[in-house]
A protein has these predicted regions:
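Helix-start/capping segments and mature chain N-termini
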Residues: 1-67, 71-130
Length: 130
């Protein structure tokens, strides 16, 4: 049995995709990112017009590698922001949470601004862990 998701009860809810853009290749996996966003939009009853999003993505132009963040609101408004992707000069030290996730939690299937679980767990990390 599928658990319903009540998107209207979460103020400012957005779907999120973050992707790489490179001067020589554009956004290599953008098809996969937009497919995932489209599926989530359909499931969560978000308006999704891929042609407008594609138009915006095709206008990206930079001599640098970019970290791009695409957000979509329930009424179909989207925002695309970019930032120069700086080389990572340090080793990452990671930590694992002791919390057990529930496969019944429908929010784990969607990349959204509903990130309470992630924020709570990240706040528990000791200094120096990524």
């Amino acid at each position: 049995m599928e658990i319903p998701i009540y998107t209207s009860s979460i103020e400012g809810l957005e779907l999120i995709e973050t992707f790489l853009w490179e001067p020589e290749h554009g956004a290599p996996d953008i098809d996969l990112h937009l497919e995932r966003m489209c599926k989530s939009a359909g499931k969560l009853k978000f308006k999704f017009e891929s042609s407008k999003i594609w138009e915006k993505i095709h206008k990206i132009n930079s001599e640098n590698r970019l970290r791009c963040r695409l957000t979509l609101t329930i009424d179909g408004k989207f925002n695309l922001t970019t930032a120069v992707l700086q080389p990572n000069s340090k080793k990452w030290i990671i930590g694992l949470s002791n919390s057990v996730l529930s496969s019944a939690d429908p929010w784990l299937l969607h990349k959204s601004s509903n990130r309470e679980l992630y924020d709570t767990e990240r706040a528990k990390l000791p200094d120096g862990l990524d």
